[in-house]
Design a protein with these regions (language model features):
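Amphipathic alpha-helical scaffolding segments comprising HEAT/armadillo-like alpha-solenoid repeats
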Residues: 1, 8-19, 40-50, 136-149, ...
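Structural detector for internal amphipathic alpha-helices that build alpha-solenoid repeat scaffolds
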Residues: 1-6, 28-37, 126-132, 158-169, ...
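Long hydrophobic alpha-helices with heptad-repeat/coiled-coil character
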Residues: 3, 21-33, 209, 227, ...
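Cytosolic small-GTPase signaling regions in large eukaryotic proteins
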Residues: 3-5, 20-21, 28-73, 230-232, ...
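Alpha-helix N-cap/helix-start positions at coil->helix boundaries
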Residues: 9, 24-28, 154-155, 171, ...
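Extended repeat-based scaffolds of very large eukaryotic assembly and lipid-transport proteins
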Residues: 46-186, 256-257, 261-276
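C-terminal structured domains
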Residues: 188-195, 223, 227-230, 236-276
Length: 276
């Protein structure tokens, strides 16, 4: 991503033929990179490079690519979901509007969308699901998906069932995942634990970041602890904070006011609890 944004002309020149070529993974990756570049202000450059070919069909193909509905921006080939994907026996996502559960057909589509690459941006269809369904039911569904993946032997090619926790997870997800992250290095699963740190960061809530910071503060597996420290530093930088400032914001306030006091109200009697 950094290289593409630094050298957009070279990148577009190299990517264009693949983006307009044979359907497949190479085309999907090239188109995703071009979309990222256009979203970062390089659409005029893309159109200029297309015109250099002096071929109307190239210009037309690029214009068609730019006009593509965001919901159509998904891999050309959608593989069959794995055998462990059995959503009919899991917690079902519930609609906010009427508390109805999603039907099997919608759960099939949800599984397919969770498989789509999410590196550059979340697929718009998933944003629609998050807007339509309750956060807690989505988190429970995704946890069931994750545990099914673990029970199936955690196949690496289906790791989307793990990283989906970062897409649809919540505070409870972070609390349940953290003990596993802490234990995995001792089970020769350092790489999985590292992905777990990424998931906590992706959830991004104060509770999730508190869990991440707890790993950064204390863990017997030092390589993972250092990686957690790096994640906290990156998050602090993205928020224009120092690490100390971020940690201060993540510290639980225990219900205290700015003076470090808590008012206990028992009707006719009140007590103030203060901490030095």
């Amino acid at each position: 991503r950094t290289w593409l944004l630094k050298y957009p002309e070279h990148a577009i020149t190299g990517l264009l033929s693949a983006a307009l070529g044979k359907a497949g993974e190479a085309q999907d990756n090239a188109r995703a990179a071009l979309r990222m570049l256009t979203e970062n202000g390089h659409q005029p450059l893309l159109q200029e490079i297309a015109r250099r070919y002096n071929q109307p069909e190239v210009t037309d193909a690029v214009n068609a690519l730019l006009a593509l509905d965001p919901l159509d921006n998904h891999p050309t080939k959608i593989p069959t979901l794995p055998a462990f994907y059995q959503p009919s026996i899991w917690t079902r996502p519930v609609l906010k509007a009427n508390a109805q559960s999603l039907p099997d057909s919608a759960l099939l589509r949800l599984g397919e969308m969770l498989r789509f690459p999410q590196e550059e941006a979340l697929y718009p269809g998933l944003l629609q699901v998050k807007a339509a369904c309750t956060a807690d039911s989505l988190a429970e569904f995704t946890w069931d998906l994750f545990t099914a993946w673990l029970a199936a032997g955690a196949p690496s090619k289906e790791s989307w069932a793990f990283t989906a926790l970062g897409v649809l997870g919540n505070d409870d997800t972070a609390r349940k995942l953290t003990p596993l992250i802490r234990a995995w290095p001792g089970e020769s699963q350092h790489k999985r634990a590292t992905v777990g740190l990424d998931i906590l960061a992706a959830i991004g809530s104060d509770i999730a970041l508190m869990q991440l910071n707890g790993i950064a503060q204390k863990l017997k597996f030092k390589a993972l602890q250092e990686r957690a420290k790096e994640k906290i530093a990156d998050i602090a930088e993205s928020r224009k904070l120092t690490v100390a400032e971020l940690e201060d914001r993540l510290a639980p306030d225990l219900g205290l006011d700015d003076n470090g006091s808590l008012l206990l109200d028992f009707g006719p009697r009140q007590f103030t609890v203060s901490f030095d």
